[in-house]
Amino acid sequence: MKTKITSLLGASIIASTSLAQVSPVISSWLRNTTGITGRHYVSGNSTPINDSYLANVQSVKYSTNFVYVSCTGIPSYVIGPYLDGNPNQGGNNSNIYKIPLVPVANTGSLSPTTGGTIGVFINGVSLFDYRDGVSWKSSTSSLCGGPIMPPCTGDGVWNRDAVVAERAGFDCAKGHPAMTNYHHHQNPSAFNLDLTVISSICNLYASDALYVINSSVHSPIIGYAYDGFPIYGAYGYKNADGSGGIVRMKSSFSLRSITTRNTLYTSTATVTPGPAVSTTYPLGYFKEDYQYVPTTTLTPDYLDIHNGRFCVTPEYPLGTYCYFATVDANHNSAYPYVVGPTFYGVKNVSKVTSITETTTTYTGSATTSLQTINLDAAINIYPNPSADLIMIQSKELLSHDLKVELSNLTGQIVAKKDFYQGSTICYFETTGLYNGTYFLTIIDNGIKKSFKVIINN
């Protein structure tokens, strides 16, 4: 079966890349065409600070075999603060990613994911796997390792899950920095947009993150893994052939039924013990608390051991292997989160210091505009009637800036905002406005669309 899938995969990708200018691995990147720079919060100040370095992707170039993505590693959405004491702040990392046009399935020994960058999101931000470099040290009955606990080294048997253990240190967009390398370990949607909100960070430090989960449509490509295969958001077609409707793609990993940590799910042999399961170290605190239950033909919406599957997607109508950013029914991140614990393909994406072959620069036109999207379906304005705040949410990533104006019944403009490229949310504070009817107008190069809103403070 794997041979058949591999051959189909190769055919589909070759078909999709025969015209390189329309290949998703070239056209999916969020290029900075407006000069937008990064922004960040510091603790105690909910007004974003403008940074000097550019956000998103600066250029996309391609050759016969590779795509080169140049980026700072900084998104256009506001990042920070990190309330667990993390002293770092994201900065310009001057990355050039070299990605194969045709990724290759690994038919030999699988490559495990590692610490550090294991993929790149479409805005140039790094993807990390579950880990934070901390593990249990049995001889001292304590956690060791990671950037904040050197030079202590753990046993490397019970490895801490950053998504669980470092939640207090994630910003509203579910990211944080390692030195200047801002990154996500998990589905990059904002905490306050989850169906069950498990962090209050967005209350003071709002950010829209990379994309908004929409359960009614197939999620977009949100990145590429270090084996060159695409990463999608949380939702896809139920069946691999594109049938069955839109469903949440589910992880095939589940928590083990254990109270002591002295074995791994792959064997009954005793290993160096970790701490007993407790409120301090609950199930899920360590990666080894999970077990993999293989999916079957009866559960096509459950993913394989790499957190992906071969399937049809909107961008790959002939099919491709792809990963999904998994969430649970409450839209909270679900292990193994994006990619892992091993890659499906040959790990062949790299960072390079320069481009040493002849390339073509991709200059594809922006596609997300008032001319190309149905605003009534793609824009959500809430709450309406509004008290304190009006949120404008786009279900698609904006590929260029829009202007937004709020005016009263006499036509007087009472507030203006920029809806930035790469954003999905823009908002107005309304506490200083009189109650009544207003019009919210979105403007794109002279084309306007207005919505009626009610303010009732």
Question: What are these model-predicted stretches?
Answer:
Residues 62, 68-115, 119-122, 188-242, ...:
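A short, polar beta-strand/turn micro-motif
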Residues 227-229, 234-353:
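Extended, compositionally biased non-globular segments
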Residues 132, 137, 145-207, 226-227, ...:
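Core of folded catalytic or high-affinity ligand/protein-binding domains
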Residues 21-171:
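Solvent-exposed N-terminal domain segments of exported/luminal and surface proteins
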Residues 360-376:
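Low-complexity, Pro/Thr/Ser/Gly/Ala-rich linker/spacer regions in secreted
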Residues 1-22, 370:
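Bacterial Sec-dependent N-terminal signal peptides
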Residues 371-382, 386-457:
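C-terminal outer-membrane/trafficking sorting elements
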